[in-house]
């Protein structure tokens, strides 16, 4: 049944999932004041595993449903299903096993709310976004981005069970940051790959509204993102260390967005795309250090 294990590893989009589970991990840490109890550590480890399995399953389902699109795009034409290294039924079985394992772990050994939120996120990305939104509207990334923004809340839920309104409020701030970050992140890539998207008949914003309009939207979202990133500090969720890091990271992000309005070359949008990945990792790392590590130094 199974081909080279590497093909199945590639089906999970490991680099993308790594960023997803990192933000979930930060959500877990931020949810716990002080030193975590053994029960919180246990729930965190199992929650991390369950979220990782679900995210991997969603990535595999996405490749299964998008195989005909991936075949038309240079960026994705190498994927295992496209080149025939795995068969559709193998991907379906693989993803199903991951989903079952994820739900068993989350329901039996973490808590029900984490399982429900995780499953809803999986369906939101793998089905609602992939099957409908991606093909239906130029706002696909904006609307569908909510599913991809959920991991910090999933991590938060794993160690708290979302018992109070503050759990929902604080974890929602983390979700909001990723939700606002998602459009400029993907639109920068879409500008560079717009011919691929047009060929595959995917209505990404640069295809439907043009590059100039997309660059302006990137600028708008970047300004909103910079403002939203102040909220964890303003509500007392994080301290000065995070604030300083967020200001620097957003200053660079805004510079990229401003430069995108009149880029020096065609490759500049990819430079912003790659920086946006570093940006999100660093921003959540600042949240992590500020909340937990810094007080112990």
From Swiss-Prot:
More details: Carbon 2 of the heme B porphyrin ring is defined according to the Fischer nomenclature.
Keyword Transferase listed: yes
Annotated GO biological processes are: heme O biosynthetic process
List the keywords (alphabetical): Cell inner membrane, Cell membrane, Heme biosynthesis, Membrane, Transferase, Transmembrane, Transmembrane helix
User: Gene3D superfamilies attached here?
Assistant: UbiA prenyltransferase
The chemistry this enzyme catalyses reads:
heme b + (2E,6E)-farnesyl diphosphate + H2O = Fe(II)-heme o + diphosphate
Residues in coiled coil: none
Q: Top enzyme class of this protein?
A: transferase
For this protein, the record's InterPro entries field holds:
Protohaem_IX_farnesylTrfase (IPR006369), UbiA_prenyltransferase (IPR000537), UbiA_prenylTrfase_CS (IPR030470), UbiA_sf (IPR044878)
This protein's record includes keyword Electron transport = no
How is this protein situated with respect to the membrane? Multi-pass membrane protein
Q: Where is the protein situated, by its record's location annotation?
A: Cell inner membrane
Spell out the family assignment given in the record's similarity comment: Belongs to the UbiA prenyltransferase family. Protoheme IX farnesyltransferase subfamily.
Purpose: Converts heme B (protoheme IX) to heme O by substitution of the vinyl group on carbon 2 of heme B porphyrin ring with a hydroxyethyl farnesyl side group.
Which NCBIfam families does its entry note? cyoE_ctaB (TIGR01473), PRK04375.1-2 (NF003349)
Cystine pairs: none
Instruction: State a GO cellular component annotated for this protein.
Output: plasma membrane
Pathway(s) where this gene product acts: Porphyrin-containing compound metabolism; heme O biosynthesis; heme O from protoheme: step 1/1
Q: What is an example of a GO molecular function annotated in this UniProt entry?
A: protoheme IX farnesyltransferase activity
Quote the protein name from its UniProt record.
Protoheme IX farnesyltransferase
What EC numbers are recorded for this enzyme?
A: 2.5.1.141
């Amino acid at each position: 049944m199974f081909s080279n294990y590497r093909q199945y590893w590639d089906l999970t989009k490991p680099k993308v999932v790594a960023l997803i589970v990192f933000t979930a991990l930060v959500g877990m840490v931020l949810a716990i004041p002080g030193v975590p109890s053994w029960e919180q550590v246990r729930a965190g480890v199992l929650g991390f595993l369950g979220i990782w399995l679900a995210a991997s399953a969603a990535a595999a389902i996405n490749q299964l449903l998008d195989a005909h699109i991936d075949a038309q795009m240079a960026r994705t034409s190498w994927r295992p299903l496209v080149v025939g290294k795995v068969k559709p039924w193998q991907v379906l079985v693989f993803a199903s096993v991951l989903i079952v394992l994820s739900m068993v772990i989350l329901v039996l050994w973490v808590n029900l709310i984490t399982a429900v939120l995780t499953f809803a996120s999986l369906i939101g990305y793998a089905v609602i976004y992939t099957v409908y939104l991606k093909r239906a509207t130029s706002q696909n990334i904006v609307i569908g981005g909510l599913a991809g923004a959920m991991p910090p809340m999933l991590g938060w839920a794993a160690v708290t069970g979302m018992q109070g309104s503050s759990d929902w409020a604080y974890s929602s701030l983390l979700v909001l940051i990723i939700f606002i970050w998602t459009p400029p992140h993907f639109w920068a890539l879409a500008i560079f790959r717009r011919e691929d998207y047009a060929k595959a008949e995917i209505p990404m914003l640069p295809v439907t509204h043009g590059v100039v309009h997309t660059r302006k939207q990137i600028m708008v979202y970047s300004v909103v993102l910079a403002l939203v990133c102040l909220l964890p500090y303003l509500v007392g969720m994080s301290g000065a260390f995070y604030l300083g890091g967020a200001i620097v990271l957003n200053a660079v992000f805004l510079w990229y967005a401003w430069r995108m309005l009149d880029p020096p070359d065609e490759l500049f949008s990819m430079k912003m795309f790659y920086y946006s990945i570093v940006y999100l990792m660093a921003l959540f790392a600042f949240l992590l250090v500020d909340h937990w590590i810094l007080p112990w130094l």
